[in-house]
Amino acid sequence: MIKPVRTMLFDLDGTIVDTNELIIRSFLEALKGVVPEGFSREHIIPSMGLTLSDQMKIFSGLEQVDHLIAAYREVNYRLHNELVKPFAYVGEVMDHLQKQGVRIGIVTTKMRLSTEKSLKFVGLYDYIVPDAIVTIDDVKNAKPHPEPVLMALDKLGVEPADAIMVGDSPVDMQSANAAGVVSVGVAWSLKGAEKLRESGAKHVIDDMRELYAFAGLEREKLAGR
């Protein structure tokens, strides 16, 4: 285990907020008539974590994908409240971490508008330091580049060695490692724990409550797991 940290950065989708089905449904509906018959969730999951633009280019084979992005966002907005929920223990853990003085930031490839919408909808927004929400709108280089992680740390006035980055995607692990931050993968990732380890995850957790140990808090909080 690393020395206790007082700053934790989190990816959003698939890490603390379960938007997996929303994302998959949005792609499938937006890409109808564009992708070959048989295109399914199994084709989508490996690229989740990349920017929406990059994913649409990969799936469609097109360079100009603005119309597909617009279609995706329409579906995503329409189904958001029906399909989005927090993962187990996320609210409990963030509440306890915040009360113990741990500062929490978000590093995501989503737009700011949709990021804040999801955080507020699932009741997590108040646990986050607002200035430390870094979205695709804020950076020139998205994950796996280190820029988003470094920007969040700069907003918090924290050195890389004093923080961890928690995520569900290879690009989260790569961005964290490139920034000099300890990378922590979540085993509930659709990509699987082994894929995160292969991508450089220094740790993989099976339960959000395992994060208490990274802040030097008592592990008895895991009771009842």
Say what each PLM segment does.
Residues 2-100, 116:
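N-terminal helical cap/lid subdomain that shapes the substrate entry/recognition surface
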Residues 15, 108-110:
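Conserved phosphate-coupling serine/threonine residues in phosphotransfer and NTP-handling enzymes
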